Amino acid sequence: KLAGDRRASGVVILHRGKILAEQYWKPDEGARAGNKEREYGALVRGRDAAGQVIEDVASVQKSIAAILVGMARHQGLLGLDDPVTKHLGPGWTKASPEQEQAITVLHLLTMTGGLKDDLTFEAAPGTRWRYNSAAYARTLQVVAAAAKKTPNALTREWLTGRIGMGDSSWVERAGAGGEAGLNALGFATTARDLARFGLLILADG
């Protein structure tokens, strides 16, 4: 009940790797109740075999992207101290070439790249923290470029296909691309698939 009151769409509780409790709320419940904050129907991207929603999980995808960066690093495809320009080329920000060159993969992961939301320069990398989804979204692009694979191909090969997250994939977000295609992809998944991901993290990968 608490999760539903906090506008959750679903919750799965695991104990020793097994489902202890599971509950879902319909996408239109908030709309019927007149609660605009509970409306998340626009995030629904389908349903799994059990009829539960597959939805864009918004900023939860940052954890997925971070794990993929770690996997790419483990394979020697990139380093955390690599300039982002090494993988994306110049011009991925609106900063000067010198300012842009100083931003590393680690800066993106720690949100200390020194960029504003529109990717203009704000501060020297590493000197200021700013929650920046637009900049963080570039981490997935970095991994894809380093691996020479599409986001869905590498995610399926490295992660979702290996641990049984069969209802998870990257999906295009209509109208979310913006001028530079920022946040153009969202990670669509289910509560059960995220539970599998949680078990992976709990087991130290």
Predicted regions and their residues:
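Active-site helix/loop module of the DD-peptidase/beta-lactamase fold
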Residues: G46-R47, G51, D56-S59, H74-L115, ...
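Aromatic- and histidine-enriched alpha-helix N-cap/loop-to-helix transition segments
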Residues: R6-S9, E55-I64, E100-I103, W129-A137, ...
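Active-site-proximal alpha-helical segments within enzyme catalytic domains
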Residues: A135-V142, L185-G205
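Active-site SXXK
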Residues: G17, E37-A42, G51-D81, T139-A144, ...
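Amphipathic alpha-helical interface segments
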Residues: E122-Y136, V142-V143
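Active-site-proximal beta-strand/loop segments in catalytic clefts of secreted hydrolases
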Residues: L14-R16, Q23-W25, V60, M111-G113, ...
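A short, well-structured edge-of-sheet supersecondary motif
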Residues: A3-R47
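Generic structural signal for alpha-helix termini and adjacent loop/cap motifs
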Residues: K1, Q75, M111, L200-D204
